[in-house]
Amino acid sequence: MAAAAQLSLTQLSSGNPVYEKYYRQVEAGNTGRVLALDAAAFLKKSGLPDLILGKIWDLADTDGKGVLSKQEFFVALRLVACAQNGLEVSLSSLSLAVPPPRFHDSSSPLLTSGPSVAELPWAVKSEDKAKYDAIFDSLSPVDGFLSGDKVKPVLLNSKLPVEILGRVWELSDIDHDGKLDRDEFAVAMFLVYCALEKEPVPMSLPPALVPPSKRKTWVVSPAEKAKYDEIFLKTDKDMDGYVSGLEVRETFLKTGLPSALLAHIWSLCDTKGCGKLSKDQFALAFHLINQKLIKGIDPPHSLTPEMIPPSDRSSLQKNITGSSPVADFSAIKELDTLNNEIVDLQREKNNVEQDLKEKEDTVKQRTSEVQDLQDEVQRESINLQKLQAQKQQVQELLGELDEQKAQLEEQLQEVRKKCAEEAQLISSLKAEITSQESQISSYEEELLKAREELSRLQQETAQLEESVESGKAQLEPLQQHLQESQQEISSMQMRLEMKDLETDNNQSNWSSSPQSVLVNGATDYCSLSTSSSETANFNEHAEGQNNLESEPTHQESSVRSSPEIAPSDVTDESEAVTVAGNEKVTPRFDDDKHSKEEDPFNVESSSLTDAVADTNLDFFQSDPFVGSDPFKDDPFGKIDPFGGDPFKGSDPFASDCFFKQTSTDPFTTSSTDPFSASSNSSNTSVETWKHNDPFAPGGTVVAAASDSATDPFASVFGNESFGDGFADFSTLSKVNNEDAFNPTISSSTSSVTIAKPMLEETASKSEDVPPALPPKVGTPTRPCPPPPGKRPINKLDSSDPLKLNDPFQPFPGNDSPKEKDPDMFCDPFTSSTTTNKEADPSNFANFSAYPSEEDMIEWAKRESEREEEQRLARLNQQEQEDLELAIALSKSEISEA
């Protein structure tokens, strides 16, 4: 501050009366000092960030008094001008030549709206930017961006409140895309470090913090801007930062454009309508003029967003609608002279009134200190409340995290338990797989053996079929030979019969005896006829057998062992009929294989001891089949043609897994058929069926089976999960003991047995069927509470303050609720909607004795209004005292002069 103290007011202001004007606007009451609140409000109009303004205040107010003198205020203005022109904010910059500062002030057109955004240097220094870039790269950005999840831990490490961190994120995310690039991350870290240094975070991002890459481009290029700035400095002769229409008239007319077009360009560039153009507006006007002259592009009817000067973009909505006259700088100089004289007089007067001023200064200082302390206490109390709220939030968050930790531990235990179970299951499955693999290998070996056995049996079958075919081939000529022999025998027998008839006829002619005898024996004609009929029957039977054997469906039958009949040696008629009596006429078969067997065609003549009595012999007086059965010696009845089955000893497919059968048949092992409709069962089974009707009304008790062997499915489903309790109706109530539709009752007792369960079922329905549930009654809706203004205030019934209406007393006035209130334990879901006693609703949760929310709001409003009135009264009193003091001082000065 020593360097600043050496500079005079003229050196600080560079002879520009604007500094004096700014001072007079802020300094009120001719006290010679600028209060901190007034100076802060005025300096914020410069558009600089709060961080830079705070630094400027610290450099100006070196003593930390909280007030600025005139010289200190000029130093602050000079530093503001340095910051607006991109110079370093330090005391060494006071000696540099800079234009006067510019402030946002709608009362004067001479004050610009602040520096150009494009001209402002970035507040983030290069060394800080390098440090922030290193942090940015350590977070592993994706495509040059960091998401909120990656930036959040870095911001939380600063230990700043969540509200401030949220504001930092909103300010740094300039693109509002939910991600931060390298420049945006640098802005965020810059704001975080500023907040850690107890500097306030702005509500909106200052222009100086906007990265150059995020600043909108202007249609006027930097080269054009530099050229137009030189023209502007030559035109702005009063150095107030603006050019009027008179100053630029000649310059614009030299372009050769029509006056109407120049007027349109002037109206477009004069965005504030103050009749003057700033440096940026002047550059835009010349840009539009050159576009028309060089490219022939007419100016637009209104400015596009990229045409708006950067200095006017922030204050575009605050356009100035009126113009004000140019300030009279000569009058300002005279006022400055008078002010210097007054200062000299005040210095002389200070020697006389030094004690009084020191006391007043002490009082004011103490007052300001007290006020500062009060403000500090208020701020600290607010911070304490915020910290307490944050502490509560952290505690709640910690509790939630503890709960989540407990839940996760439980889930972890469950998962570990499940993993152990799964591991055990896997081990058991592996063991089962190993056993199954061993079984499969054994089954494969058995299958190979079975296939070998099958191939062997197939070969044996083929051999047997070949032997059968060869036997058939041998049988066919034998059968044919047999037929021929039978035909010859039948023809021979016919010839013998005819011969006998002729002989009988001849004998009847000459015989006179009553009992004539055949010439060659005692065999009569009936025996011959019998033998002939037997021969005919045998021929028919042989033909039928030959026809059956010739069919292809009976090729597998075994070879029949038939007697081979050789052609008999038939003697002539003289040899066939012999003279000796009672001899048998026997056809002979000369086959070696059947020589010892009985001849099926041997006809034994009946022993007729008596001769024919009469010549008129009746051959049908006696039954020729009484003595013997002609078919008792059937050669084809003793041998089974299918007895030689080659596969009856073993099943060639027994080892195949697809033809295996269980060792026990579930439908044959049971002793009784449970589905048999026969009525030969005992009365106990009938009664059991009658008592075990699962479909009777109300359900019946299904008695357990007395004998487990009667279950036809026990061998199949005995070990299954549903084998014991599948379709088990044993849990039903015991109501009906008889089944009216029992199919096992015999017809003789069905009427009595069916009539009885029907009567018993009717009785059981009326006695044991459970009653139906009562209909559900909806819960009565809760009555709406009375409005706050109409709440009844209950008076105390008792003088005892402890015996108030307890809203949570469940049994008012009863000592033993169990005895005196029988409805206490009643069913709350019964259909009855009326109760013996109705509870008083006013006794439940009665908070009418306390003030309502509306009353509290009204009280808060009254208190805030009262405090505001007191504050305004104090301010008015202070202003009145200052005014009286100023009047007294001016009167004393006038009287002395």
From Swiss-Prot:
Keywords: Acetylation, Calcium, Cell membrane, Coated pit, Cytoplasm, Endocytosis, Endosome, Membrane, Metal-binding, Phosphoprotein, Protein transport, Repeat, SH3-binding, Transport, Ubl conjugation
Pfam families: EH
Domain UIM: 852-871, 878-897
Phosphothreonine PTM positions: 321, 779, 781
Biased composition (Basic and acidic residues): 585-599, 758-768
SUPFAM superfamilies recorded: EF-hand, Myosin rod fragments
SMART domains: EFh, EH, UIM
Comp. bias (Low complexity): 667-685, 744-754
Region (Disordered): 528-607, 667-692, 741-849
GO MF: calcium ion binding; identical protein binding; polyubiquitin modification-dependent protein binding; SH3 domain binding; ubiquitin binding
Compositionally biased region (Polar residues): 528-561
Entry comment on modification after translation: Phosphorylated on serine upon DNA damage, probably by ATM or ATR. Phosphorylation on Tyr-850 is involved in the internalization of EGFR. Not required for membrane translocation after EGF treatment or for targeting to coated pits, but essential for a subsequent step in EGFR endocytosis. Ubiquitinated.
Positions of modified residues (Phosphoserine): 108, 140, 323-324, 467, 470, 485, 561-562, 748, 798, 816
Any GO CC annotation of this UniProt entry: clathrin coat of coated pit
Effect listed in the UniProt record for changing residue 850 to F: Inefficient EGFR internalization
Annotated ranges, domain EF-hand: 48-83, 160-195, 223-258, 262-292
Residues that bear Phosphotyrosine: 850
Residues the record lists as binding Ca(2+) 1: 173, 175, 177, 179, 184
Example GO biological process: endocytic recycling
Membrane-protein topology: Peripheral membrane protein
Main location: cytoplasm
Domain notes: The EH domain interacts with Asn-Pro-Phe (NPF) motifs of target proteins.
PANTHER family cross-referenced by the UniProt entry: EH DOMAIN (PTHR11216), EPIDERMAL GROWTH FACTOR RECEPTOR SUBSTRATE 15 (PTHR11216:SF54)
Record protein name field: Epidermal growth factor receptor substrate 15
